[in-house]
Amino acid sequence: MKRIIGYVNTADLNHMRKEDVLALDVINIAFGLIRDGEVVWDAKDAKEGITSIHEIHPELKIVLSVGGWGADGFSQAARTQEGREKFAASALEIVKEYGLDGVDIDWEYPGTSLAGIASDKSDKENYTLLLAELRKTLDAYKEGMFVTTAVGGD
C-alpha cells in the first residue's frame, strides 16, 4: 500500500490548505523534543489545527515526530529500561491528549554525535529497545497506533 506522508511544522497546523490535507495519508508533526527523558511538545493551538484537519480529511493519520536534527536526549532516554518506559509513557500522554495516531522517531543519529548531541556506543541497540518499548506502550493503549522512524540512507 502506497502512503503519502508529509512533515508539517506545529505552527503550520492551523494554516494547511484543503488540497494539501486531502493529498496526504499521514501527517508527521515536527517536532516534539526530549527533556529530562520525557517527550515534550510546544503545541500552542495544535488541537484546533488537528480538529480542522480531521474535519477536512477524517481518515488522515496524524503522528508526532520526536527529534530532528540537533535534538538531544535520545541517548540518555534510551539507555535504561526505566528511561525507555518513561519516554514511552510521556509520548503516550501526548498521543492521548491530542488524539494522535502514533509517534515518529527522528533520532539523528544513534551512535554518533554528528548533530552535536550526546551519543554512546550502545545507542544502536538501545534505539531498537526504545522503539520496542514505544510499540508495546502504544499497543497496550490502542491497536493500530503508528510507530515510525526516519532513517538515513547510508
Please tell me what each predicted stretch does.
Residues S65, D104, T148-A150:
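Outer-envelope exported proteins of Gram-negative bacteria
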Residues G116-E125:
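Glycine-rich tight-turn/loop motif centered on a GG-T
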